[in-house]
């Protein structure tokens, strides 16, 4: 039986659009040969071409991850890093590629005759790096070897595809291929990034905090393009992960079915994936840190950059996205995309696209989070929809994440009302995005939070002094005893035998205990442990936490324990920190599932819980 609580609630949504990144204003040559999206007058929304994936993602023969030519030693180190990441081994010493940086921050180059027609574009891409870092690109001369202490140089040529070697890898010529399809400013900037030592951004081990990789949509045999490295094998210099990095894959690279292979956890940021317009602020900061640019340029007398900005090679402030001004003093939270972010906790409510029922604006990105009490579910009903039509909803769309709000959801567009959406937990995320052209009326929807009355809490007591009772064997090495006092009341008693933790497992029987790996010592990094507790048909699982300690974060996105009460209903919390339910949790059916996930840093003691089979 469901008890639907209807309370008055209405959320008025204000107009919001995604702010363009701001920062140092430079004369950056813009890409002119990229395909333009046709206007509504010529296409009526039916023939538009989706945003193309970066050309550097198209696989070149012999290249790793599409466009990186690695030496045998580099490939061995990368494969070791990937194997270490998969096996959860401790990090190796960071060796990538400090010895392969360009000495004195000078990179000699030649443009071969085959690329003479692209020389202006290539020079513009090098200028872009020079304008924002302390790196200098110099035409190769006979004096370079004596000045720099090596004979290495990069050579641009018209090869087969878009690719580059990584770092200073050879003692003489080091080629960068700018093939016929690669004549784009951003693509050349990307390949130069590899030459100075950058790997792809999505290879970082902390990527799962920012993006989801959808291997189910990846072409068979191309999965290695999405492998992660260990921290010991990347050079991040404490620069935050950046979905807008010019070194990041786009959203549809290596797709087998036209669906995304990468999405951002924050759906408002999906449009930043694969940008090849210019270096991002994080790209610039990373280059300046690994080449120690601030040690070369004396900016000690320059005014301090505000709001996380930093000095470039010319002592100008480079500002984070949404900040501007000489010192990054302008903008900020009032113009950030988060302004179009709404959270609903009332039992009923209404959500609409910005400006509804008038047309929404171009380049809109909004998120609506709905959260109910633990154990509840959410039903979302669309009342009106008029959104630009495209088969896969790649232009404008409303997306509903009804299972895992950090994963990909189902997209809707056009004029057909979607079916009622029902969440599997107490959380649902709805996002709305639009592209740079063609707008419509948008959408209107209402939601109701539903309380499941079948989730009840029975009363139990834990005792540490075991009486003389019958001993039952459980699936783990600890021993528990069950004493029956009368048909309606049972007392669960636990021996003093320490519980032995595990990374997942299946637990059956009348009662037992589960614990995280190494408990009560700290668990390891990079874990995913699945625990299944199952009792006889017709009975329920009752779970009581005895101790709990996981890395704390507001949304539990780093380390977490997720509990599924069965029958598609999830307890609506990713538990973390030191707080846990004081009452017992009872499954909907005869099965309960726990999922422990940890990231690549910061540990805690984990958890231990007792379970038993009960009758309701």
UniProtKB/Swiss-Prot annotation:
EC number: 3.4.24.-
Residue numbers annotated as active site: 191
Signal peptide: 1-16
Keyword DNA-binding on entry: no
SMART domains referenced in this protein's UniProt entry, alphabetically: CUB, ZnMc
GO biological process: proteolysis
GO molecular function: metalloendopeptidase activity; zinc ion binding
Cross-referenced PROSITE patterns: ASTACIN (PS51864), CUB (PS01180), EGF_1 (PS00022), EGF_3 (PS50026), ZINC_PROTEASE (PS00142)
Cofactor annotation: Zn(2+)
Region (Disordered): 30-67, 461-491
Tissue: Asymmetrically along the animal-vegetal axis of the blastula.
Chain ranges of the EGF-like domain: 289-329
UniProt xrefs under Pfam families: Astacin (PF01400), CUB (PF00431)
Amino-acid biosynthesis in keyword set: no
CDD domains: CUB, EGF_CA, ZnMc_astacin_like
Prosegment location in residue numbers: 17-93
Keywords, alphabetical: Cleavage on pair of basic residues, Developmental protein, Disulfide bond, EGF-like domain, Hydrolase, Metal-binding, Metalloprotease, Protease, Repeat, Signal, Zinc
Residue pairs linked by disulfide bridges in the UniProt entry: 134-293, 162-182, 299-317, 319-328, 340-366, 393-413, 503-529, 556-576
Occurrences of domain Peptidase M12A (ranges): 93-294
SUPFAM superfamilies noted in UniProt: Metalloproteases ('zincins'), catalytic domain, Spermadhesin, CUB domain
CUB domain mapped to chain residues: 340-450, 503-614
The protein, known as: Protein SpAN
């Amino acid at each position: 039986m469901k008890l639907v609580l209807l309370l008055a609630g209405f959320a008025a949504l204000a107009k919001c659009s995604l702010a363009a990144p701001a920062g140092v204003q430079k004369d950056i040559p813009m890409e002119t040969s990229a395909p333009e999206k046709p206007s509504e007058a010529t296409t009526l929304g039916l023939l538009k071409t989706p945003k193309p994936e970066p050309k550097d993602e198209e696989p070149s023969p012999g290249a790793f991850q599409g466009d990186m030519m690695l030496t045998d030693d580099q490939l061995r180190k990368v494969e070791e890093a990937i194997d270490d990441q998969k096996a959860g081994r401790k990090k190796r010493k960071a060796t990538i590629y400090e010895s392969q940086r360009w000495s004195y921050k000078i990179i000699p180059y030649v443009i071969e005759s085959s690329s003479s027609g692209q020389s202006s574009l290539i020079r513009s891409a090098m200028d872009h790096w020079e304008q924002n870092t302390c790196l200098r690109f110099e035409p190769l001369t006979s004096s370079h070897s004596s000045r720099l202490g090596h004979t290495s140089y990069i050579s641009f040529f018209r090869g087969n595809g878009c690719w580059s070697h990584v770092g200073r890898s050879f003692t003489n010529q080091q080629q960068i291929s700018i093939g016929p399809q690669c004549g784009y400013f951003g693509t050349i900037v990307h390949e130069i990034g590899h030459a100075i030592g950058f790997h792809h951004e999505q290879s970082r081990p902390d990527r799962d905090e920012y993006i989801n990789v959808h291997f189910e949509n990846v072409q068979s045999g191309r999965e290695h393009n999405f492998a992660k490295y260990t921290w010991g094998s990347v050079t991040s210099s404490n620069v935050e992960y950046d979905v807008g990095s010019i070194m990041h894959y786009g959203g549809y690279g290596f797709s087998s079915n036209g669906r995304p292979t990468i999405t951002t956890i924050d759906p408002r940021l999906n449009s930043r994936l694969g940008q090849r317009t210019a270096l991002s602020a994080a790209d610039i900061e990373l280059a300046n840190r690994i080449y120690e640019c601030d040690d070369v340029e004396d900016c000690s007398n320059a005014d301090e950059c505000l709001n996380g900005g930093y000095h470039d090679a010319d002592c100008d402030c480079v500002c984070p996205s949404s900040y501007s001004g000489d010192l990054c003093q302008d903008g900020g939270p009032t113009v950030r995309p988060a302004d179009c972010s709404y959270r609903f906790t009332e039992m009923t409510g209404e959500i609409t696209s910005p400006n509804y029922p008038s047309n929404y604006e171009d380049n809109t990105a909004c998120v609506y989070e709905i959260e109910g009490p633990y154990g509840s579910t959410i039903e979302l009903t669309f009342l009106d929809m008029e959104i630009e039509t495209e088969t896969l909803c790649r232009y404008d769309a409303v997306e509903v994440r009804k299972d895992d709000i950090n994963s990909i959801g189902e997209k809707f567009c056009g004029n057909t009302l979607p079916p009622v959406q029902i969440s599997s937990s107490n959380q649902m995320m709805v996002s709305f995005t639009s592209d740079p052209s063609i707008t419509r009326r948008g959408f209107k929807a209402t939601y109701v939070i539903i309380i499941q009355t079948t989730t009840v809490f029975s009363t139990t007591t834990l005792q540490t002094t075991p009486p003389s009772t019958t001993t039952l064997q459980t699936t783990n090495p600890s021993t528990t005893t069950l004493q029956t006092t009368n048909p309606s009341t049972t007392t669960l008693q636990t021996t003093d035998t320490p519980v032995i933790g595990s990374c997942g497992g299946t637990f059956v029987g009348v009662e037992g205990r589960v614990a995280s790996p190494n408990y009560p010592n700290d668990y390891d990094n990079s874990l995913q442990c699945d625990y299944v507790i199952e009792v006889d048909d017709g009975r329920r699982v009752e779970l009581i936490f005895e101790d709990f300690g996981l890395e704390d974060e507001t949304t539990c996105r780093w380390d977490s324990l997720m509990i599924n009460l069965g029958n598609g209903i999830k307890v609506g919390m990713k538990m973390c920190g030191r707080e846990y339910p004081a009452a017992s949790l009872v499954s909907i059916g005869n099965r309960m599932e726990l999922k422990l996930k940890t990231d690549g840093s910061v540990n805690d003691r984990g958890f231990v819980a007792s379970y038993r089979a009960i009758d309701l």
